[in-house]
Amino acid sequence: MTQKLESVGSERKSSEYMWDDGSEHDDVTKIYVRGGTKGIEFIKFGYVKAGELLDGSFHGYSDTGFTQMFEIDHRKNEHLLSVEGYFDYYNDIMYAIQFKTNLKISEIMGYEYSGHKFTLAMEGKKIIGFHGFADVNLRALGAYVTWITPARMEAKGGKGGNEWDDGGDYEAVTKIHGRSDHKGIKDIIFDYVDKDGHPKSETHGPTSGQGYVLEPFEINHLDKEYLMSIDGYYDDASGVIQALQFKTNMKTSELMGYYDDDAVKFTIGCTVNKIIGFHGHAGKNLYSLGAYFTTLPLTKLEYEDSFREKLPKNGASGNLWDDGSFQGVKKVHIYYDGYSVRCVRFDYDDDGKVESREHGPKIVAAVQEGGFVLDYPNEVITSVEGIATVVNTGLSFSTGNVMIKSLTFKTSKGRTSPTFGNVFGNYLSEFKLESQGCAIVGFHGRSSYNSIHGLGAYFFPMPPSHDGKALEEQGGDGGLGGV
Protein backbone atom coordinates (compact mmCIF):
# COMPACT_ATOMS: atom_id res chain seq x y z
CA MET A 1 0.00 0.00 0.00
CA THR A 2 1.29 3.44 -0.95
CA GLN A 3 1.61 6.04 1.79
CA LYS A 4 2.06 9.80 1.44
CA LEU A 5 4.71 11.54 3.56
CA GLU A 6 3.75 15.18 4.03
CA SER A 7 6.13 17.77 2.64
CA VAL A 8 8.79 19.35 4.84
CA GLY A 9 9.85 22.96 4.36
CA SER A 10 8.03 26.22 3.76
CA GLU A 11 4.83 26.89 5.65
CA ARG A 12 3.88 29.62 3.16
CA LYS A 13 2.69 27.30 0.40
CA SER A 14 0.82 28.69 -2.60
CA SER A 15 -1.42 26.38 -4.63
CA GLU A 16 -0.08 28.00 -7.79
CA TYR A 17 3.37 26.54 -7.14
CA MET A 18 2.43 23.17 -5.68
CA TRP A 19 3.58 20.16 -7.72
CA ASP A 20 2.99 16.41 -7.52
CA ASP A 21 4.74 13.71 -9.57
CA GLY A 22 2.30 11.12 -8.24
CA SER A 23 2.86 7.64 -6.85
CA GLU A 24 2.22 5.48 -9.93
CA HIS A 25 5.85 4.43 -10.31
CA ASP A 26 7.88 1.34 -9.44
CA ASP A 27 11.08 3.19 -8.53
CA VAL A 28 13.03 6.43 -8.76
CA THR A 29 15.88 6.21 -11.31
CA LYS A 30 17.55 9.64 -11.55
CA ILE A 31 17.64 12.80 -9.48
CA TYR A 32 18.86 16.20 -10.72
CA VAL A 33 19.49 18.99 -8.21
CA ARG A 34 20.61 22.53 -9.04
CA GLY A 35 22.05 24.36 -6.07
CA GLY A 36 23.73 27.65 -5.33
CA THR A 37 24.40 30.16 -2.59
CA LYS A 38 20.69 30.98 -2.57
CA GLY A 39 19.72 27.38 -1.90
CA ILE A 40 18.27 24.57 -4.01
CA GLU A 41 16.97 26.20 -7.21
CA PHE A 42 15.27 23.24 -8.84
CA ILE A 43 14.87 19.49 -8.58
CA LYS A 44 13.88 16.89 -11.18
CA PHE A 45 13.18 13.16 -10.86
CA GLY A 46 13.26 10.27 -13.30
CA TYR A 47 11.08 7.21 -12.65
CA VAL A 48 10.45 3.71 -13.98
CA LYS A 49 7.07 2.01 -14.42
CA ALA A 50 6.74 -1.56 -15.73
CA GLY A 51 10.23 -1.31 -17.22
CA GLU A 52 9.55 2.00 -19.01
CA LEU A 53 11.68 5.01 -18.04
CA LEU A 54 9.68 8.17 -17.32
CA ASP A 55 11.15 11.69 -17.38
CA GLY A 56 9.72 13.99 -14.72
CA SER A 57 9.27 17.76 -14.80
CA PHE A 58 11.56 20.47 -13.45
CA HIS A 59 10.39 21.92 -10.14
CA GLY A 60 11.82 25.36 -9.44
CA TYR A 61 13.82 27.87 -11.47
CA SER A 62 17.27 27.68 -13.08
CA ASP A 63 19.62 30.51 -12.13
CA THR A 64 23.38 30.72 -11.63
CA GLY A 65 24.51 27.61 -9.78
CA PHE A 66 25.60 24.04 -10.39
CA THR A 67 23.67 20.87 -11.23
CA GLN A 68 24.37 17.51 -9.59
CA MET A 69 22.94 14.15 -10.64
CA PHE A 70 22.39 10.96 -8.65
CA GLU A 71 21.54 7.76 -10.52
CA ILE A 72 19.71 4.74 -9.07
CA ASP A 73 20.05 1.43 -10.93
CA HIS A 74 16.66 -0.28 -10.65
CA ARG A 75 18.04 -3.16 -12.78
CA LYS A 76 20.22 -4.11 -9.80
CA ASN A 77 17.21 -3.99 -7.48
CA GLU A 78 18.36 -0.62 -6.10
CA HIS A 79 15.69 1.48 -4.36
CA LEU A 80 15.58 4.99 -2.92
CA LEU A 81 15.10 4.68 0.84
CA SER A 82 15.43 8.16 2.31
CA VAL A 83 16.06 11.86 1.78
CA GLU A 84 17.84 14.14 4.24
CA GLY A 85 18.09 17.90 3.93
CA TYR A 86 18.59 21.25 5.61
CA PHE A 87 15.84 23.88 5.56
CA ASP A 88 16.07 27.43 6.90
CA TYR A 89 12.60 28.40 8.12
CA TYR A 90 13.64 32.02 8.73
CA ASN A 91 14.76 32.62 5.13
CA ASP A 92 12.35 30.03 3.68
CA ILE A 93 15.18 28.29 1.81
CA MET A 94 16.18 24.65 1.34
CA TYR A 95 19.98 24.71 1.30
CA ALA A 96 21.10 21.09 0.99
CA ILE A 97 19.76 17.63 0.24
CA GLN A 98 21.14 14.07 0.27
CA PHE A 99 19.72 10.75 -0.98
CA LYS A 100 20.18 7.20 0.35
CA THR A 101 19.44 3.94 -1.47
CA ASN A 102 19.81 0.35 -0.30
CA LEU A 103 23.22 0.26 -2.04
CA LYS A 104 24.76 3.71 -1.70
CA ILE A 105 24.46 7.30 -0.46
CA SER A 106 24.79 10.40 -2.62
CA GLU A 107 27.18 13.20 -1.83
CA ILE A 108 25.50 16.18 -0.22
CA MET A 109 23.91 18.42 -2.86
CA GLY A 110 23.97 22.12 -2.13
CA TYR A 111 25.41 23.78 0.94
CA GLU A 112 24.84 23.19 4.64
CA TYR A 113 23.90 26.34 6.49
CA SER A 114 22.39 26.72 9.91
CA GLY A 115 18.91 25.35 9.64
CA HIS A 116 16.52 22.55 10.44
CA LYS A 117 17.63 19.05 9.42
CA PHE A 118 14.80 16.86 8.12
CA THR A 119 14.36 13.28 6.92
CA LEU A 120 11.84 11.69 4.55
CA ALA A 121 11.80 7.94 5.16
CA MET A 122 9.76 5.08 6.58
CA GLU A 123 11.26 1.84 7.89
CA GLY A 124 10.95 -1.07 5.46
CA LYS A 125 9.62 1.10 2.63
CA LYS A 126 11.03 2.67 -0.54
CA ILE A 127 10.31 6.05 -2.12
CA ILE A 128 8.46 5.84 -5.47
CA GLY A 129 7.35 9.44 -6.01
CA PHE A 130 7.64 13.04 -4.83
CA HIS A 131 5.51 16.13 -4.32
CA GLY A 132 6.26 19.60 -3.01
CA PHE A 133 6.28 23.35 -3.48
CA ALA A 134 8.65 25.35 -5.72
CA ASP A 135 8.73 28.87 -7.15
CA VAL A 136 12.14 30.46 -7.79
CA ASN A 137 13.53 27.86 -5.36
CA LEU A 138 12.57 24.46 -4.04
CA ARG A 139 10.64 25.39 -0.89
CA ALA A 140 9.20 22.07 0.32
CA LEU A 141 9.56 18.36 -0.43
CA GLY A 142 7.41 15.34 0.38
CA ALA A 143 7.35 11.74 -0.83
CA TYR A 144 5.30 8.63 -1.58
CA VAL A 145 6.49 5.32 -0.12
CA THR A 146 5.53 1.67 -0.46
CA TRP A 147 6.69 -1.67 0.96
CA ILE A 148 9.85 -3.31 -0.36
CA THR A 149 9.21 -6.88 -1.48
CA PRO A 150 11.97 -9.26 -0.32
CA ALA A 151 13.85 -11.03 -3.12
CA ARG A 152 13.24 -14.80 -3.30
CA MET A 153 15.88 -17.30 -4.42
CA GLU A 154 14.49 -20.61 -5.60
CA ALA A 155 15.18 -23.70 -3.49
CA LYS A 156 18.29 -25.71 -4.31
CA GLY A 157 18.90 -29.39 -3.64
CA GLY A 158 17.05 -32.56 -4.54
CA LYS A 159 13.39 -33.29 -5.14
CA GLY A 160 11.15 -34.89 -2.56
CA GLY A 161 9.10 -34.26 0.56
CA ASN A 162 6.55 -31.51 1.09
CA GLU A 163 6.95 -27.82 0.42
CA TRP A 164 7.35 -25.42 3.36
CA ASP A 165 7.78 -21.64 3.44
CA ASP A 166 8.70 -19.47 6.43
CA GLY A 167 8.22 -16.26 4.41
CA GLY A 168 10.44 -13.20 4.20
CA ASP A 169 8.84 -10.85 6.71
CA TYR A 170 11.49 -11.23 9.42
CA GLU A 171 14.17 -8.80 10.53
CA ALA A 172 16.91 -11.41 10.92
CA VAL A 173 17.88 -15.05 11.34
CA THR A 174 19.28 -15.50 14.86
CA LYS A 175 20.02 -19.23 15.25
CA ILE A 176 20.22 -22.40 13.15
CA HIS A 177 20.15 -25.89 14.67
CA GLY A 178 18.86 -29.36 13.91
CA ARG A 179 19.76 -33.05 13.56
CA SER A 180 21.40 -35.34 11.03
CA ASP A 181 21.50 -39.08 10.28
CA HIS A 182 23.33 -41.42 7.88
CA LYS A 183 21.38 -40.02 4.91
CA GLY A 184 21.98 -36.33 5.65
CA ILE A 185 20.17 -33.44 7.35
CA LYS A 186 17.14 -34.94 9.13
CA ASP A 187 15.50 -31.79 10.40
CA ILE A 188 16.46 -28.14 10.63
CA ILE A 189 15.27 -25.39 12.94
CA PHE A 190 15.47 -21.67 12.14
CA ASP A 191 15.11 -19.06 14.88
CA TYR A 192 13.99 -15.64 13.66
CA VAL A 193 13.25 -12.23 15.11
CA ASP A 194 10.45 -10.20 13.54
CA LYS A 195 10.42 -6.46 12.84
CA ASP A 196 8.95 -5.81 16.29
CA GLY A 197 11.71 -7.77 18.03
CA HIS A 198 9.61 -10.85 18.79
CA PRO A 199 11.32 -14.27 18.45
CA LYS A 200 9.86 -17.10 16.38
CA SER A 201 11.07 -20.63 15.65
CA GLU A 202 10.26 -22.87 12.65
CA THR A 203 11.09 -26.61 12.38
CA HIS A 204 11.22 -28.54 9.10
CA GLY A 205 11.53 -32.32 8.95
CA PRO A 206 10.51 -35.07 11.39
CA THR A 207 10.52 -34.31 15.11
CA SER A 208 11.00 -37.90 16.32
CA GLY A 209 14.25 -37.10 18.08
CA GLN A 210 16.27 -39.64 16.10
CA GLY A 211 19.71 -38.76 14.70
CA TYR A 212 22.51 -36.76 16.23
CA VAL A 213 22.31 -33.11 17.21
CA LEU A 214 24.14 -30.63 15.00
CA GLU A 215 26.30 -27.88 16.46
CA PRO A 216 24.03 -24.80 16.73
CA PHE A 217 25.06 -21.63 14.89
CA GLU A 218 24.08 -18.35 16.55
CA ILE A 219 23.96 -14.97 14.83
CA ASN A 220 24.06 -11.78 16.90
CA HIS A 221 21.89 -9.43 14.86
CA LEU A 222 22.00 -6.84 17.67
CA ASP A 223 25.74 -6.52 16.99
CA LYS A 224 25.11 -5.97 13.25
CA GLU A 225 25.91 -9.56 12.32
CA TYR A 226 23.98 -10.78 9.28
CA LEU A 227 23.53 -14.15 7.57
CA MET A 228 24.86 -13.64 4.06
CA SER A 229 25.35 -17.00 2.32
CA ILE A 230 25.06 -20.79 2.56
CA ASP A 231 27.06 -23.60 0.99
CA GLY A 232 25.23 -26.91 0.71
CA TYR A 233 25.73 -30.44 -0.59
CA TYR A 234 23.07 -32.95 -1.63
CA ASP A 235 23.00 -36.54 -2.87
CA ASP A 236 21.80 -36.63 -6.46
CA ALA A 237 20.33 -40.14 -6.12
CA SER A 238 18.28 -39.69 -2.94
CA GLY A 239 17.81 -35.92 -3.24
CA VAL A 240 18.66 -35.46 0.46
CA ILE A 241 20.75 -32.48 1.57
CA GLN A 242 23.79 -34.00 3.28
CA ALA A 243 25.53 -30.95 4.73
CA LEU A 244 25.17 -27.19 5.17
CA GLN A 245 27.56 -24.40 6.12
CA PHE A 246 26.38 -20.88 7.00
CA LYS A 247 28.36 -17.64 6.62
CA THR A 248 27.83 -14.21 8.14
CA ASN A 249 29.78 -10.99 7.71
CA MET A 250 31.70 -11.96 10.88
CA LYS A 251 32.12 -15.74 10.95
CA THR A 252 31.47 -19.13 9.35
CA SER A 253 29.68 -22.07 10.98
CA GLU A 254 31.10 -25.55 11.37
CA LEU A 255 30.01 -27.90 8.60
CA MET A 256 26.61 -29.25 9.65
CA GLY A 257 26.47 -32.91 8.57
CA TYR A 258 28.77 -34.65 6.08
CA TYR A 259 28.91 -35.08 2.32
CA ASP A 260 30.15 -37.72 -0.12
CA ASP A 261 32.82 -37.05 -2.72
CA ASP A 262 30.23 -37.18 -5.48
CA ALA A 263 27.76 -34.86 -3.71
CA VAL A 264 26.40 -31.90 -5.69
CA LYS A 265 27.42 -28.52 -4.24
CA PHE A 266 25.18 -25.44 -4.29
CA THR A 267 25.43 -21.90 -2.94
CA ILE A 268 22.72 -19.53 -1.77
CA GLY A 269 23.69 -15.90 -1.28
CA CYS A 270 24.32 -12.40 -2.59
CA THR A 271 27.11 -10.10 -1.40
CA VAL A 272 24.89 -7.02 -1.01
CA ASN A 273 21.95 -8.72 0.73
CA LYS A 274 21.20 -10.51 3.99
CA ILE A 275 19.09 -13.65 4.36
CA ILE A 276 15.91 -13.06 6.39
CA GLY A 277 13.85 -16.19 5.73
CA PHE A 278 13.83 -19.70 4.25
CA HIS A 279 11.67 -22.03 2.19
CA GLY A 280 12.20 -25.51 0.76
CA HIS A 281 11.07 -29.14 0.84
CA ALA A 282 11.24 -31.68 3.68
CA GLY A 283 9.92 -35.15 4.50
CA LYS A 284 11.90 -37.73 6.43
CA ASN A 285 14.90 -35.53 5.64
CA LEU A 286 15.60 -32.04 4.33
CA TYR A 287 15.51 -32.15 0.52
CA SER A 288 15.91 -28.56 -0.64
CA LEU A 289 16.57 -25.07 0.70
CA GLY A 290 15.86 -21.59 -0.67
CA ALA A 291 15.97 -18.15 0.90
CA TYR A 292 14.49 -14.66 1.09
CA PHE A 293 16.81 -11.66 0.93
CA THR A 294 16.70 -8.00 1.77
CA THR A 295 19.32 -5.30 1.54
CA LEU A 296 22.15 -4.86 4.01
CA PRO A 297 22.21 -1.58 5.92
CA LEU A 298 24.81 1.15 5.51
CA THR A 299 26.02 2.44 8.87
CA LYS A 300 26.96 6.10 9.28
CA LEU A 301 29.31 6.90 12.15
CA GLU A 302 29.45 10.56 13.08
CA TYR A 303 32.73 12.08 14.16
CA GLU A 304 30.94 13.61 17.16
CA ASP A 305 30.11 10.13 18.45
CA SER A 306 33.70 8.90 18.28
CA PHE A 307 35.05 11.35 20.88
CA ARG A 308 35.09 10.55 24.57
CA GLU A 309 33.84 14.03 25.43
CA LYS A 310 31.20 16.27 23.92
CA LEU A 311 32.71 18.40 21.18
CA PRO A 312 32.73 22.19 21.34
CA LYS A 313 29.88 23.70 19.31
CA ASN A 314 28.56 20.13 18.97
CA GLY A 315 31.36 19.43 16.50
CA ALA A 316 30.28 22.20 14.14
CA SER A 317 33.76 23.64 13.48
CA GLY A 318 34.32 24.28 9.78
CA ASN A 319 31.94 23.43 6.94
CA LEU A 320 30.18 20.14 6.35
CA TRP A 321 31.20 17.85 3.47
CA ASP A 322 29.93 14.40 2.60
CA ASP A 323 31.31 12.10 -0.12
CA GLY A 324 28.48 9.61 0.25
CA SER A 325 29.27 5.92 -0.25
CA PHE A 326 31.01 3.90 -2.96
CA GLN A 327 32.03 0.26 -3.52
CA GLY A 328 35.23 0.78 -1.55
CA VAL A 329 38.32 2.89 -0.84
CA LYS A 330 41.42 2.31 -3.00
CA LYS A 331 43.83 4.92 -1.61
CA VAL A 332 44.00 7.71 0.97
CA HIS A 333 46.11 10.86 0.66
CA ILE A 334 46.85 12.92 3.78
CA TYR A 335 48.44 16.40 3.84
CA TYR A 336 49.63 17.47 7.29
CA ASP A 337 52.13 19.53 9.28
CA GLY A 338 53.11 19.86 12.94
CA TYR A 339 49.80 21.49 13.86
CA SER A 340 47.04 19.52 12.17
CA VAL A 341 45.82 17.45 9.25
CA ARG A 342 45.30 20.10 6.59
CA CYS A 343 43.77 18.17 3.72
CA VAL A 344 42.46 14.68 2.89
CA ARG A 345 41.84 13.05 -0.47
CA PHE A 346 40.15 9.69 -0.98
CA ASP A 347 40.24 7.58 -4.14
CA TYR A 348 37.05 5.51 -4.32
CA ASP A 349 35.91 2.62 -6.51
CA ASP A 350 32.76 3.67 -8.33
CA ASP A 351 31.71 0.60 -10.35
CA GLY A 352 35.24 0.16 -11.69
CA LYS A 353 35.98 3.86 -12.13
CA VAL A 354 38.17 5.85 -9.75
CA GLU A 355 36.39 8.80 -8.15
CA SER A 356 38.50 11.19 -6.05
CA ARG A 357 37.22 13.60 -3.41
CA GLU A 358 39.44 16.22 -1.75
CA HIS A 359 38.72 18.36 1.30
CA GLY A 360 40.75 21.09 2.98
CA PRO A 361 43.79 23.09 1.76
CA LYS A 362 46.92 21.19 0.75
CA ILE A 363 48.90 24.31 -0.18
CA VAL A 364 50.14 25.28 3.28
CA ALA A 365 53.72 26.10 4.28
CA ALA A 366 55.77 23.05 5.37
CA VAL A 367 52.95 20.62 4.59
CA GLN A 368 53.90 16.95 4.22
CA GLU A 369 52.13 14.49 1.93
CA GLY A 370 51.48 10.88 2.88
CA GLY A 371 49.59 8.09 1.16
CA PHE A 372 48.27 4.63 1.96
CA VAL A 373 47.38 2.23 -0.87
CA LEU A 374 44.95 -0.66 -0.43
CA ASP A 375 45.22 -3.99 -2.24
CA TYR A 376 41.65 -3.39 -3.31
CA PRO A 377 39.32 -5.32 -3.69
CA ASN A 378 41.19 -7.96 -1.66
CA GLU A 379 41.86 -5.46 1.14
CA VAL A 380 39.58 -2.85 2.66
CA ILE A 381 39.81 -0.22 5.39
CA THR A 382 38.16 -1.47 8.58
CA SER A 383 38.92 1.36 11.01
CA VAL A 384 40.37 4.84 11.43
CA GLU A 385 42.00 6.11 14.61
CA GLY A 386 42.78 9.74 15.22
CA ILE A 387 43.67 12.47 17.66
CA ALA A 388 41.88 15.81 17.81
CA THR A 389 42.67 18.98 19.67
CA VAL A 390 41.02 22.31 20.42
CA VAL A 391 42.53 25.61 19.32
CA ASN A 392 41.78 29.24 20.18
CA THR A 393 41.17 28.43 23.82
CA GLY A 394 43.05 28.64 27.05
CA LEU A 395 40.29 27.13 29.10
CA SER A 396 39.20 23.56 28.35
CA PHE A 397 38.08 21.09 25.71
CA SER A 398 34.54 22.42 25.99
CA THR A 399 35.31 25.65 24.09
CA GLY A 400 37.16 26.58 20.91
CA ASN A 401 37.43 24.90 17.52
CA VAL A 402 38.21 21.24 16.91
CA MET A 403 41.11 20.30 14.62
CA ILE A 404 42.24 16.81 13.62
CA LYS A 405 45.94 16.37 14.49
CA SER A 406 46.59 12.83 13.27
CA LEU A 407 45.00 9.89 11.43
CA THR A 408 45.87 6.17 11.25
CA PHE A 409 44.15 3.58 9.04
CA LYS A 410 43.78 -0.19 9.59
CA THR A 411 42.80 -2.81 7.02
CA SER A 412 41.21 -6.25 6.72
CA LYS A 413 44.65 -7.77 6.07
CA GLY A 414 45.94 -6.58 9.43
CA ARG A 415 48.02 -3.75 7.99
CA THR A 416 48.30 -0.42 9.77
CA SER A 417 49.23 2.78 7.96
CA PRO A 418 51.83 5.19 9.32
CA THR A 419 50.39 7.80 11.65
CA PHE A 420 49.88 10.91 9.54
CA GLY A 421 50.28 14.04 11.68
CA ASN A 422 51.37 14.99 15.18
CA VAL A 423 50.21 13.09 18.28
CA PHE A 424 51.52 15.61 20.84
CA GLY A 425 49.96 18.76 22.29
CA ASN A 426 47.36 20.06 24.74
CA TYR A 427 43.63 19.37 24.98
CA LEU A 428 43.95 16.09 23.06
CA SER A 429 41.17 13.58 22.59
CA GLU A 430 41.40 10.21 20.82
CA PHE A 431 38.67 8.91 18.54
CA LYS A 432 38.03 5.74 16.55
CA LEU A 433 35.77 4.94 13.59
CA GLU A 434 34.98 1.22 13.47
CA SER A 435 32.01 -1.11 12.99
CA GLN A 436 32.72 -4.79 13.56
CA GLY A 437 32.48 -6.96 10.46
CA CYS A 438 32.21 -3.93 8.19
CA ALA A 439 34.38 -2.07 5.68
CA ILE A 440 34.59 1.69 5.19
CA VAL A 441 32.98 2.67 1.88
CA GLY A 442 32.89 6.46 2.20
CA PHE A 443 33.81 9.43 4.36
CA HIS A 444 32.19 12.63 5.56
CA GLY A 445 33.38 15.40 7.85
CA ARG A 446 34.13 19.08 8.29
CA SER A 447 36.88 21.31 6.93
CA SER A 448 37.79 24.97 6.49
CA TYR A 449 40.35 27.09 4.68
CA ASN A 450 43.16 25.80 6.92
CA SER A 451 42.31 22.41 8.45
CA ILE A 452 40.25 19.24 8.74
CA HIS A 453 37.93 19.65 11.72
CA GLY A 454 36.08 16.33 11.80
CA LEU A 455 35.98 12.93 10.11
CA GLY A 456 33.20 10.34 9.95
CA ALA A 457 32.66 7.25 7.82
CA TYR A 458 30.13 5.01 6.11
CA PHE A 459 30.38 1.26 6.80
CA PHE A 460 29.03 -1.71 4.86
CA PRO A 461 29.10 -5.37 6.00
CA MET A 462 31.99 -7.35 4.50
CA PRO A 463 31.11 -10.49 2.53
CA PRO A 464 32.74 -13.82 3.46
CA SER A 465 35.93 -14.50 1.51
CA HIS A 466 36.20 -17.39 -0.95
CA ASP A 467 37.60 -19.74 1.69
CA GLY A 468 34.50 -19.21 3.81
CA LYS A 469 36.06 -16.87 6.36
CA ALA A 470 34.93 -13.30 6.71
CA LEU A 471 37.55 -10.66 5.99
CA GLU A 472 38.86 -9.63 9.37
CA GLU A 473 41.90 -8.08 11.00
CA GLN A 474 44.66 -10.65 11.38
CA GLY A 475 47.42 -8.78 13.22
CA GLY A 476 50.69 -7.31 12.06
CA ASP A 477 51.56 -3.93 10.61
CA GLY A 478 52.05 -2.75 7.07
CA GLY A 479 54.02 0.08 5.60
CA LEU A 480 53.53 3.18 3.57
CA GLY A 481 51.78 2.79 0.26
CA GLY A 482 52.77 4.75 -2.81
CA VAL A 483 52.05 8.45 -2.85
UniProtKB/Swiss-Prot annotation:
UniProt keyword annotation of Secreted present: no
A Pfam cross-reference name: Jacalin
Domain of life: Eukaryota
Molecular-function GO term, any one: carbohydrate binding
Keywords per UniProt: Lectin, Repeat
SUPFAM superfamilies the record matches: Mannose-binding lectins
Domain Jacalin-type lectin: 2-147, 150-295, 307-461
Region spans: Disordered: 1-20
Protein family per UniProt: Belongs to the jacalin lectin family.
Protein name: Jacalin-related lectin 13
Species for this entry: Arabidopsis thaliana (Mouse-ear cress)
